[in-house]
Amino acid sequence: FLFAFISHFAYNFCFGISMIPFRDSILNQTSVIWALFCAALALYVDDDSRRSFPLKQWQKIVLLVLLCVLAFPSDWSCFPVLCTLHIHKNRGNLEKQMLGMMLYISMYVIVWCLAIDVTYGLVQYGILIVWPFMHFYNGTRGNWRGMKWFFYFFYAGHLFLMGILRILLYGNVSTIVG
Protein backbone atom coordinates (compact mmCIF):
# COMPACT_ATOMS: atom_id res chain seq x y z
CA PHE A 1 0.00 0.00 0.00
CA LEU A 2 2.82 2.38 0.88
CA PHE A 3 4.47 2.00 -2.52
CA ALA A 4 1.13 2.41 -4.29
CA PHE A 5 0.74 5.69 -2.38
CA ILE A 6 4.26 6.88 -3.24
CA SER A 7 3.91 5.77 -6.86
CA HIS A 8 0.62 7.65 -7.15
CA PHE A 9 2.40 10.99 -6.84
CA ALA A 10 5.27 9.98 -9.14
CA TYR A 11 2.83 8.66 -11.79
CA ASN A 12 0.61 11.73 -11.67
CA PHE A 13 3.62 14.06 -11.81
CA CYS A 14 5.03 12.11 -14.76
CA PHE A 15 1.89 12.50 -16.85
CA GLY A 16 0.68 15.87 -15.58
CA ILE A 17 -2.42 14.43 -13.90
CA SER A 18 -3.99 16.21 -10.95
CA MET A 19 -2.76 14.82 -7.63
CA ILE A 20 -6.37 14.96 -6.45
CA PRO A 21 -8.09 11.79 -7.68
CA PHE A 22 -11.12 12.05 -9.98
CA ARG A 23 -10.69 15.79 -10.48
CA ASP A 24 -10.64 15.50 -14.28
CA SER A 25 -11.55 11.89 -15.07
CA ILE A 26 -12.07 8.42 -13.66
CA LEU A 27 -9.41 6.84 -15.92
CA ASN A 28 -5.66 6.69 -15.25
CA GLN A 29 -5.90 8.35 -11.86
CA THR A 30 -3.03 6.45 -10.29
CA SER A 31 -0.23 4.06 -11.18
CA VAL A 32 -0.37 0.37 -11.96
CA ILE A 33 1.14 -0.29 -8.51
CA TRP A 34 -2.32 0.32 -7.02
CA ALA A 35 -3.82 -2.28 -9.36
CA LEU A 36 -1.00 -4.69 -8.47
CA PHE A 37 -1.73 -4.10 -4.77
CA CYS A 38 -5.36 -5.01 -5.50
CA ALA A 39 -4.09 -8.08 -7.40
CA ALA A 40 -2.06 -9.20 -4.37
CA LEU A 41 -5.19 -8.86 -2.22
CA ALA A 42 -7.14 -10.82 -4.84
CA LEU A 43 -4.63 -13.68 -4.59
CA TYR A 44 -5.12 -13.69 -0.82
CA VAL A 45 -8.91 -13.75 -1.21
CA ASP A 46 -8.84 -16.49 -3.83
CA ASP A 47 -6.26 -18.82 -2.27
CA ASP A 48 -7.81 -20.71 0.67
CA SER A 49 -4.45 -22.08 1.79
CA ARG A 50 -3.14 -18.56 2.50
CA ARG A 51 -5.95 -17.56 4.86
CA SER A 52 -6.63 -18.76 8.39
CA PHE A 53 -10.37 -18.37 7.87
CA PRO A 54 -12.75 -19.78 5.26
CA LEU A 55 -14.60 -17.76 2.65
CA LYS A 56 -17.67 -18.99 0.82
CA GLN A 57 -17.59 -18.82 -2.98
CA TRP A 58 -20.08 -15.93 -3.11
CA GLN A 59 -17.94 -13.99 -0.61
CA LYS A 60 -14.88 -14.50 -2.79
CA ILE A 61 -16.76 -13.32 -5.87
CA VAL A 62 -18.02 -10.18 -4.10
CA LEU A 63 -14.54 -9.36 -2.79
CA LEU A 64 -12.88 -10.00 -6.16
CA VAL A 65 -15.41 -7.79 -7.96
CA LEU A 66 -14.82 -5.11 -5.32
CA LEU A 67 -11.06 -5.33 -5.88
CA CYS A 68 -11.59 -4.99 -9.65
CA VAL A 69 -13.74 -1.89 -9.04
CA LEU A 70 -11.09 -0.44 -6.71
CA ALA A 71 -8.40 -1.07 -9.35
CA PHE A 72 -10.48 0.40 -12.21
CA PRO A 73 -9.24 4.02 -11.92
CA SER A 74 -5.58 2.98 -12.06
CA ASP A 75 -3.32 2.58 -15.05
CA TRP A 76 -4.26 -0.75 -16.67
CA SER A 77 -7.61 -0.65 -14.83
CA CYS A 78 -8.75 -3.99 -13.39
CA PHE A 79 -6.68 -6.08 -15.80
CA PRO A 80 -3.69 -6.63 -13.46
CA VAL A 81 -6.14 -8.21 -11.00
CA LEU A 82 -7.69 -10.43 -13.68
CA CYS A 83 -4.37 -11.40 -15.28
CA THR A 84 -2.73 -12.15 -11.93
CA LEU A 85 -5.58 -14.42 -10.89
CA HIS A 86 -5.51 -16.16 -14.27
CA ILE A 87 -1.74 -16.68 -14.17
CA HIS A 88 -1.97 -18.04 -10.61
CA LYS A 89 -4.82 -20.43 -11.44
CA ASN A 90 -2.85 -21.77 -14.43
CA ARG A 91 0.49 -22.04 -12.67
CA GLY A 92 2.84 -24.34 -14.56
CA ASN A 93 0.94 -24.03 -17.85
CA LEU A 94 2.56 -21.18 -19.78
CA GLU A 95 0.35 -21.71 -22.83
CA LYS A 96 -2.86 -21.23 -20.81
CA GLN A 97 -1.33 -18.33 -18.92
CA MET A 98 -0.38 -16.49 -22.10
CA LEU A 99 -3.64 -17.28 -23.89
CA GLY A 100 -5.68 -15.96 -20.98
CA MET A 101 -3.48 -12.91 -20.63
CA MET A 102 -3.82 -12.27 -24.37
CA LEU A 103 -7.61 -12.40 -24.08
CA TYR A 104 -7.67 -10.00 -21.12
CA ILE A 105 -5.20 -7.62 -22.77
CA SER A 106 -7.24 -7.76 -26.00
CA MET A 107 -10.31 -6.60 -24.07
CA TYR A 108 -8.28 -3.69 -22.71
CA VAL A 109 -6.91 -2.86 -26.17
CA ILE A 110 -10.37 -2.96 -27.80
CA VAL A 111 -11.81 -0.58 -25.21
CA TRP A 112 -8.92 1.86 -25.68
CA CYS A 113 -9.07 1.65 -29.48
CA LEU A 114 -12.82 2.23 -29.63
CA ALA A 115 -13.17 4.78 -26.87
CA ILE A 116 -9.92 6.70 -26.62
CA ASP A 117 -7.01 6.26 -29.03
CA VAL A 118 -6.14 3.45 -31.48
CA THR A 119 -2.37 3.91 -31.33
CA TYR A 120 -2.25 3.95 -27.53
CA GLY A 121 -4.55 0.94 -27.46
CA LEU A 122 -2.40 -1.12 -29.83
CA VAL A 123 0.80 -0.22 -27.97
CA GLN A 124 -0.60 -2.14 -24.99
CA TYR A 125 0.15 -5.38 -26.82
CA GLY A 126 3.78 -4.64 -25.93
CA ILE A 127 3.02 -6.39 -22.64
CA LEU A 128 3.46 -9.64 -24.56
CA ILE A 129 7.21 -9.11 -24.35
CA VAL A 130 6.82 -10.73 -20.92
CA TRP A 131 6.40 -14.13 -22.63
CA PRO A 132 10.13 -14.95 -22.95
CA PHE A 133 10.70 -13.98 -19.32
CA MET A 134 7.84 -16.22 -18.19
CA HIS A 135 9.07 -19.00 -20.47
CA PHE A 136 12.56 -19.06 -18.97
CA TYR A 137 11.49 -18.41 -15.36
CA ASN A 138 12.10 -21.53 -13.29
CA GLY A 139 9.66 -20.65 -10.51
CA THR A 140 12.27 -19.95 -7.86
CA ARG A 141 13.03 -16.65 -6.21
CA GLY A 142 16.39 -15.13 -7.01
CA ASN A 143 19.20 -14.81 -4.48
CA TRP A 144 19.24 -11.04 -4.22
CA ARG A 145 16.42 -9.94 -1.88
CA GLY A 146 17.04 -6.31 -2.78
CA MET A 147 15.48 -6.74 -6.24
CA LYS A 148 11.98 -6.11 -4.88
CA TRP A 149 13.05 -2.85 -3.27
CA PHE A 150 15.08 -1.85 -6.31
CA PHE A 151 11.99 -2.28 -8.49
CA TYR A 152 9.77 -0.13 -6.28
CA PHE A 153 12.30 2.67 -6.08
CA PHE A 154 13.18 2.42 -9.77
CA TYR A 155 9.49 2.58 -10.74
CA ALA A 156 8.76 5.73 -8.74
CA GLY A 157 12.14 7.26 -9.58
CA HIS A 158 11.86 6.82 -13.33
CA LEU A 159 8.35 8.30 -13.29
CA PHE A 160 9.63 11.32 -11.39
CA LEU A 161 12.48 11.80 -13.89
CA MET A 162 10.06 11.46 -16.81
CA GLY A 163 7.88 14.13 -15.17
CA ILE A 164 10.83 16.51 -15.08
CA LEU A 165 11.55 15.71 -18.74
CA ARG A 166 7.86 16.34 -19.60
CA ILE A 167 8.02 19.79 -18.02
CA LEU A 168 11.32 20.64 -19.73
CA LEU A 169 10.04 19.57 -23.17
CA TYR A 170 6.36 20.51 -23.10
CA GLY A 171 5.74 22.64 -20.04
CA ASN A 172 3.29 21.75 -17.33
CA VAL A 173 0.70 20.03 -19.54
CA SER A 174 -1.04 16.69 -19.26
CA THR A 175 0.39 14.05 -21.59
CA ILE A 176 -1.97 11.14 -20.99
CA VAL A 177 -5.52 10.43 -21.98
CA GLY A 178 -7.66 10.19 -18.90
What role is predicted for each listed range?
Residues 1-178:
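Alpha-helical transmembrane segments and their immediate juxtamembrane cytosolic regions
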